[in-house]
Structures are given as C-alpha cells and as structure tokens.
From Swiss-Prot:
The keyword Disulfide bond applies. This is Prostaglandin D2 receptor. GO terms for cellular component: membrane; plasma membrane. It comes from Homo sapiens. Receptor for prostaglandin D2 (PGD2). The activity of this receptor is mainly mediated by G(s) proteins that stimulate adenylate cyclase, resulting in an elevation of intracellular cAMP. A mobilization of calcium is also observed, but without formation of inositol 1,4,5-trisphosphate. Involved in PLA2G3-dependent maturation of mast cells. PLA2G3 is secreted by immature mast cells and acts on nearby fibroblasts upstream to PTDGS to synthesize PGD2, which in turn promotes mast cell maturation and degranulation via PTGDR. GO terms for molecular function: prostaglandin D receptor activity; prostaglandin J receptor activity.
C-alpha cells in the first residue's frame, strides 16, 4: 500500500514538540482586533480617502470594510477554536470529532481556503475603490454606489463558496498537515492525479493575480496621494472647500502638505504587510506542484507549509488594525501629535531660518 505523502495525513494525535502558544496568540490578537474594529464601525463610519467629497454615511468604503471585518471575525471564530481544541485534547483533526469521521478535517480545509480567498477578494475591492476615488473621481461619483458596495460581500462569498467546494466534487484534495492541527489544500502533486495538481495551481494562481491587482491599485492610490502632497506643498492656499478635512473640534480646516503623509505611509504599510503574508502560501503551492520533494526533506518541507499557512492567517489579524483602528479619529490625533506636529514644527523652523539668512 502506498504511504501518504504527508507524514501527519492519517495520524490521530498531535505531533510531539508543538505548542498551542502560537495558535492562541494568533486567535486572541485577531479576535481583539476584529471586535475593537466592529466597535469603532458601530460608532461611526470611517472614510478611507480624505479627498472624497463629504457625503451622508455610510460610505462605500464603510460597506466594504464592514464586510471584510465580519468575514475575518467569522474565520477566526470558526477555525482557531478547532486548532486550540486539538492541542488541548492531543487529537488530530481527523479524530477530534469521532462522530464526524474525517469530515471535520475536510470542513476545516474548506473554510481555511474559503476565508483566505474571500478576504483577498474583498481587499482587492477596497483597493480598487480607493484607487478610483482618488484617481478617477468623476467615474467614481457616477458609477460606484452604495448598492454596488453592498453587493460585494455576498457576491464574493458566493464565488468563494463555489470555488472552494470543488475538492468535494473530485477536483482537488484536502489533506491534514503536520502537526495534525491544520487541514488545507494538498499542495504537492501525485502521480496520475492531475486534478490535485490542477486545483492547487489554480487556487494559487488566482491568489497571485488578486495580490498583484491589489498591489497595483494600492501603488496607484499612493501615487495619487503623493501628487496631492506635492501640489499642496507648491500651492498650500489653493485648496478649495471640497478638500477640507474636519478637525477634532468638528470644524473644517484646509489640509497641510504633511497631512497627506499619514495616508501615504499607512497605504504603503498595508501593501507591504499584505504582500508578505500572501506570497508564502502562493510560493509553497507552486513549489509543491512542480518540485520533486525527496523523502528525507519532507519534514522540513511540511514545516515550511505550516509557516506559510500561518502567514496567510495573519492577514485577518492586521486587516482591522490597518483599515479601521489606525484610521480612527483617536489614533489620527495621537499620530499627528507624535509624528506630524514635530515634522511641521521643524519645517516652519527651517523656513524661518532660511528667511533670516536671506535677509
């Protein structure tokens, strides 16, 4: 009988030498961030791009970020407790619920792939929304409506459900990964099984295209923000009332050039983190599909697969912090006091010194 490729594919206990600490940290951090984000969303709608005309809430971005937050929170609540229960009972997912046989592992892998794909699609929708609102405002005002924003989450969910259910229909395969607390798409090829290879490559290719499109949209938005920053530096008093930002006391004030930097830096941070967390699992899928892994290297290869899956789960942790918490008025006031105000003070001092020296 041919032995399974993965060492833990048929094991019934958690592999020794592994701890639940990492899973607990990921779960608690993700739960805290998403609950805090939901609280902030419940209090007020947050607009991502400050140059967007003021409009009654909720905005399109508000609809999109609500869908992403709910998706991330559901993913954490459905998947992380299962991992922690496996560690606590020292049982692999295949036997954690004996009455379900191997169904728990299959369901875990399905939801893992579903939430990974669904979150990435929603992140692309948010990046596209931000890029259009900054770079193509007339098109945005005419075509991007609240109804369209409200349709994103259900359409994305329906597509992700259909795509991630293909292994249940014989196209692709879900397997248990070491240390026995994870199940996911099989990312190594089997002789005589093109469907396993095909689905793994198809899933990773789709994820790669979504990541590339998201990064390009974010780079386009960053380019527009930088152009605004340069224009405000050259013409600080030429901004119209539509460009005014609400101050902490509720009044509107003309934006200063340095106030564009927090948008630019936050968008750059989001792009870097999103890319770093998404690429490992994409790389591992291609590597496993086309690289002939030797028997003696399987342990290290499975450790790399586990690390890539953990990186993928980090996306749902950083999403609420970057999109909501860091965009909240309280954090913006803190950020401006600590970073923007000192930079502005130095800029004024430098200008005064230059004027005095010229006199």
């Amino acid at each position: 009988m041919k032995s399974p490729f993965y060492r833990c594919q048929n094991t019934t206990s958690v592999e020794k030498g592994n701890s639940a600490v990492m899973g607990g940290v990921l779960f608690s951090t993700g739960l805290l961030g998403n609950l805090l984000a939901l609280g902030l969303l419940a209090r007020s709608g947050l607009g991502w791009c400050s140059r967007r005309p003021l409009r009654p809430l909720p905005s399109v971005f508000y609809m999109l970020v609500c869908g992403l937050t709910v998706t991330d929170l559901l993913g954490k609540c459905l998947l992380s407790p299962v991992v922690l229960a496996a560690y606590a009972q020292n049982r692999s997912l295949r036997v954690l619920a004996p009455a379900l046989d191997n169904s728990l592992c299959q369901a875990f892998a399905f939801f893992m792939s579903f939430f990974g794909l669904s979150s990435t699609l929603q992140l692309l929708a948010m990046a596209l929304e931000c890029w259009l609102s900054l770079g193509h405002p007339f098109f945005y005002r005419r075509h991007i409506t609240l109804r369209l924003g409200a349709l994103v989450a259900p359409v994305v969910s329906a597509f992700s459900l259909a795509f991630c259910a293909l292994p249940f229909m014989g196209f692709g395969k879900f397997v248990q990964y070491c240390p026995g607390t994870w199940c996911f798409i099989q990312m190594v090829h089997e002789e005589g099984s093109l469907s396993v290879l095909g689905y793994s490559v198809l899933y990773s290719s789709l994820m790669a295209l979504l990541v590339l499109a998201t990064v390009l949209c974010n780079l386009g938005a960053m380019r527009n923000l930088y152009a605004m920053h340069r224009r405000l530096q050259r013409h600080p008093r030429s901004c119209t009332r539509d460009c005014a930002e609400p101050r902490a006391d509720g009044r509107e004030a003309s934006p200063q050039p340095l106030e564009e930097l927090d948008h630019l830096l936050l968008l750059a941070l989001m792009t870097v983190l999103f890319t770093m967390c998404s690429l490992p699992v994409i790389y591992r899928a291609y590597y496993g599909a086309f690289k002939d892994v030797k028997e003696k290297n399987r342990t290290s290869e499975e450790a790399e697969d586990l690390r890539a899956l953990r990186f993928l789960s980090v996306i749902s942790i950083v999403d609420p912090w970057i999109f909501i918490i860091f965009r909240s008025p309280v954090f913006r006031i803190f950020f401006h006091k600590i970073f923007i105000r000192p930079l502005r003070y130095r800029s004024r001092c430098s200008n005064s010194t230059n004027m005095e020296s010229s006199l």
